[in-house]
């Protein structure tokens, strides 16, 4: 089901709406103020105001779950600062988004919302947002996504042994867990005083939840230092292999609705809530796919062979085979695919989409033993002989791939959050709005150590 336009748009822009200072200044009132200086960039007050409005629009009808305006503004400003820092780091790493890529992304957003790009522009104008600002925000979101991808490719790996261990553990428990968390962050190398302050704060938050004065999502929105605080701390469905080992045993023993903690982790103190649990094997029936065994002969098109010459050559080869020549022997003699020529063109068993849609359609349309007409792909001109087909259960293979992906996701989340803390801790930040306004830019502490985070709740801490 397609989300309503306002939901998709708000989700996109709520926090990651980083606006070009020039474009924003042109569309704002006579003068736009600076909310924060971030290294060599700035967060404008208009950006901050727009992002706060977008967050509030997501909580329409649930305003009581949001913190006071000054606290919400601080949280949103910290998110905008993180986005600026990531975009700056990506720029220094050579990560770019072309206008063509940006246009495709915006067209996709419009399509998801059941409208055209022109319709999207009209909707943005009605909501008071300039199209140039919107393009800048989408560009920055894509850049941040690519920075994460680059980080994952360079730093995250999953071994076969880790997959085996996770599968064994999954078979033993057979459960998935819907979790939410609240993080009271601590900087790396926190002092005893910082640890004590964090402990007092997390105890106070836990007391509010236990007494029923705040439900867990509202407490997360108000107090959590986690990047998903404004989503109520929702972590979604996780299997045990996606949960840090320090918490996995604890969660296994919890019942839905229970809140555990405070727990001390690498990033600070955490409260965990088990929202729901379900059988991980539910609906885990076999997944059968058709695989094909085929041989092919390839004639390439290139500097030494024109399109017409290649087509004439493949026609001649096919005529020889139809006339009685052995396909395998002919492939060894004439095919220009060096990977399969030595095996008589044999490609082994493969699903239909393994070599692209055009090749797959040819194989699917043949009877066993039949030879195709010549057809063109990006590689050149082919003929293919289908040898056989079979039904294969790929559920085990898919399960391994899924587990490998979930382990990688967990590692990426842990490592990237640490990376963001380092990035934030090294940043040159000066606040120019709210109660943190100052006149001297300084190297800002990590977000978790920010002195202007919400004060501990008034409830007496409980242990």
Curated annotation (Swiss-Prot):
Keyword terms of this UniProt record: Chaperone, Isomerase, Periplasm, Repeat, Rotamase, Signal
Domain PpiC residue range list: 174-276, 289-388
Catalytic activity: [protein]-peptidylproline (omega=180) = [protein]-peptidylproline (omega=0)
Localization in the cell: Periplasm
Composition bias, Pro residues: 453-463
Enzyme Commission (EC) number: 5.2.1.8
Coiled-coil stretches noted in the UniProt entry, renumbered to this chain: none
Function in brief: Chaperone involved in the correct folding and assembly of outer membrane proteins. Recognizes specific patterns of aromatic residues and the orientation of their side chains, which are found more frequently in integral outer membrane proteins. May act in both early periplasmic and late outer membrane-associated steps of protein maturation.
Protein name: Chaperone SurA
Source species: Xanthomonas oryzae pv. oryzae (strain KACC10331 / KXO85)
Lineage per the UniProt record: Bacteria, Pseudomonadati, Pseudomonadota, Gammaproteobacteria, Lysobacterales
